A protein has these predicted regions:
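ATP-dependent adenylation/nucleotidyltransferase module used to activate substrates
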Residues: 1-9, 18-43, 111, 163
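A conserved beta-strand->alpha-helix junction
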Residues: 1-13, 80-89
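Short catalytic/ligand-binding loop motif for oxyanion handling, primarily in non-cytosolic enzymes
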Residues: 2-6, 48-52, 57, 180
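Short low-complexity, flexible loop/linker segments enriched in glycine and/or proline
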Residues: 7-12, 56-58, 186-188
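Adenosyl-5′-phosphate
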Residues: 39-41, 66-214
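Short, glycine-/Ser/Thr-/acidic-enriched flexible segments
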Residues: 46-47, 139
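Glycine-rich nucleotide phosphate-binding loop and flanking beta-alpha elements
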Residues: 47-48, 122
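A mobile, often basic/glycine-rich helix-loop segment
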Residues: 50-75
C-alpha cells in the first residue's frame, strides 16, 4: 500500500506518469537520505558509457543483424510494445555493427531517461543528485576511445582496471544486481494474460487522468 500511495503522490506532484516502478524506490530511498544529507552521488551513466548491460551487449556482440523485435525482448517489459518508436530511434544512429549501434543507443536515448528519472525522484525530496560518470570531461574522453577498449574481455572492464587497487575483487567481479519491484505482489495479480508491467502502465495512466481531470 505504501508503494502505491507514494506512486500516486509522485504522479500528482510531477503532473506526468512515472516511467518505471523503481522510480518509487528511488524516491523512498532519497527520503531516508534526506534525514542527514541534501546532496548524494549516483552511479548513473556507468553502464551506458562502459557497456554494463551484459545480457544485451552479449547478444548484440554475437548477432550480425540488429533485429528490433529481438532487441525488444531483451530491453522492454510488458506485452503492449510499440517497436516503431524503437526502430525509429535505432535507425539514425551511427555504428557499423549491432554492438556499436546499441552502444550509441544507450548513451543517447536510454541515459536521458535515467537522468530524468533520478532528477525527478530526488528533487521531489529537495535532494541534489550528482552524477560524476556523466561529467562532460569523462564523456568526451570515453567518446574518443575504441569499442574494443571499452569492452575488452568483459563489460565495464576499464572501470574494473582503474579501481582494482581500491575496491575488493569480490565486489568488482560480483554478479550484477538489479533494482526490482515485486509488482505481482503489489497488485496482487491472479494468473492471467495481464503482465505486472501492463498493470503498472495502466495504474499510471488512470492516476494521471484522475489528477488532471481527463
Amino acid at each position: 500500500e505504501k508503494f502505491l500511495t507514494t506512486a500516486r503522490h509522485m504522479i500528482d506532484k510531477r503532473l506526468e506518469p512515472l516511467s518505471v516502478p523503481n522510480e518509487v524506490l528511488i524516491f523512498l530511498m532519497t527520503m531516508e537520505v534526506k534525514r542527514k544529507n541534501t546532496v548524494v552521488l549516483s552511479g548513473e551513466g556507468a553502464d551506458e558509457l562502459f557497456w554494463g548491460y551484459d545480457r544485451i551487449f552479449k547478444w548484440a556482440n554475437r548477432t550480425n543483424n540488429l533485429d528490433v523485435d529481438e532487441f525488444d525482448n531483451y530491453y522492454c517489459y510488458g506485452s503492449n510494445k510499440d517497436n516503431e518508436v524503437l526502430d525509429f530511434a535505432l535507425e539514425g544512429l551511427p555504428g557499423e555493427t549491432p554492438l556499436e549501434k546499441l552502444g550509441y543507443y544507450f548513451q543517447i536515448f536510454h541515459l536521458q531517461g535515467l537522468l530524468r528519472r533520478l532528477d525527478n525522484s530526488t528533487m521531489l525530496c529537495s535532494v541534489e543528485a550528482r552524477v560524476p560518470f556523466v561529467d562532460h570531461r569523462l564523456v568526451e574522453m570515453i567518446a574518443g576511445t575504441s569499442f574494443d577498449w571499452k569492452m575488452g574481455h568483459s563489460f565495464k572492464e576499464p572501470l574494473k582496471r582503474i579501481f582494482k587497487e581500491i575496491i575488493p575483487n569480490e565486489i568488482i567481479n560480483r554478479k550484477k544486481i538489479g533494482f526490482p519491484v515485486p509488482l505481482d505482489e503489489i497488485f496482487d495479480l491472479p494468473i492471467s494474460n495481464e503482465s505486472s508491467m501492463d498493470r503498472w502502465l495502466l495504474f499510471n495512466l488512470e492516476n494521471f487522468r484522475n489528477f488532471n481531470n481527463y
